[in-house]
């Protein structure tokens, strides 16, 4: 099982990053809340991973910290929540925001996440609340707002918007809904990551 990667970032196509470790390139899917914090292309990164094996694919999901990975692993234990939905949940909310929403039983906030209906939101509250009791409360102590740690190369407006829509679609939003979310941001000159971040913020 692949649990950790340390290597050079070759490509960043939200929500997927290509990282080269020991001469091998690994495609890793990451929640956008983690993706924002990655260094620039050609810089070194350390990613904690969860490896999923299916009949038709082998998938790597990556996180910037062990607590974030631990939360992901608890999420996919919930009935009806697979890796893709867990990724979407942690893209729409930071780990701390999700923990807070569950502890306060904020169903209305949870149903705004892609793929999460009322029944799934209620299930998340019931099952995850019990799971949190067995986890250290200080694991998700940071409640800092989303922030990019480095400047990204500017794409053209059309490229940035297209990539942002594609990323939101990959996270579970319908194409038309994703397009509306990006248009609603109202920042035609923004880069792809900024568009995604602002769109997800507005959705919650």
Swiss-Prot record:
The keyword Membrane does not apply. This is Holliday junction branch migration complex subunit RuvA. GO terms for cellular component: cytoplasm; Holliday junction helicase complex; Holliday junction resolvase complex. SMART domains: HhH1. InterPro entries: DNA_helicase_Holl-junc_RuvA_I, Hlx-hairpin-Hlx_DNA-bd_motif, NA-bd_OB-fold, RuvA, RuvA_2-like, RuvA_C, RuvA_C_sf. Residues 65-143 are annotated as: Domain II. It comes from Erwinia tasmaniensis (strain DSM 17950 / CFBP 7177 / CIP 109463 / NCPPB 4357 / Et1/99). Homotetramer. Forms an RuvA(8)-RuvB(12)-Holliday junction (HJ) complex. HJ DNA is sandwiched between 2 RuvA tetramers; dsDNA enters through RuvA and exits via RuvB. An RuvB hexamer assembles on each DNA strand where it exits the tetramer. Each RuvB hexamer is contacted by two RuvA subunits (via domain III) on 2 adjacent RuvB subunits; this complex drives branch migration. In the full resolvosome a probable DNA-RuvA(4)-RuvB(12)-RuvC(2) complex forms which resolves the HJ. Residues 144-155 are annotated as: Flexible linker.
């Amino acid at each position: 099982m692949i649990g950790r990667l340390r290597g050079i970032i070759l490509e960043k196509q939200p929500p997927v990053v290509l990282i080269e470790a020991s001469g091998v390139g690994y495609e890793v899917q990451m929640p956008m809340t983690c993706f924002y914090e990655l260094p620039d292309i050609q810089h070194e990164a350390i990613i904690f991973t969860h490896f999923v094996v299916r009949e038709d694919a082998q998938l790597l999901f990556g996180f910037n910290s062990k607590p974030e990975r631990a939360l992901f692993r608890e999420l996919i234990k919930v009935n009806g929540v697979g890796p893709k939905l867990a990724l979407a949940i942690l893209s729409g909310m930071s780990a701390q925001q999700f923990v807070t929403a569950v502890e306060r039983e904020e169903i209305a906030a949870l149903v705004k996440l892609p793929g999460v209906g009322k029944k799934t939101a209620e299930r998340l509250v019931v099952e995850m609340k019990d799971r949190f009791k067995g986890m250290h409360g200080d694991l998700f102590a940071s409640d800092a707002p989303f922030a990019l740690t480095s400047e990204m190369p500017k794409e053209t407006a059309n490229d940035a918007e297209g990539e942002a829509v594609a990323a939101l679609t990959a996270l579970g939003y319908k194409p038309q809904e994703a397009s509306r979310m990006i248009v609603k941001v109202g920042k035609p000159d923004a880069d792809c990551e900024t568009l995604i971040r602002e769109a997800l913020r507005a959705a919650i």
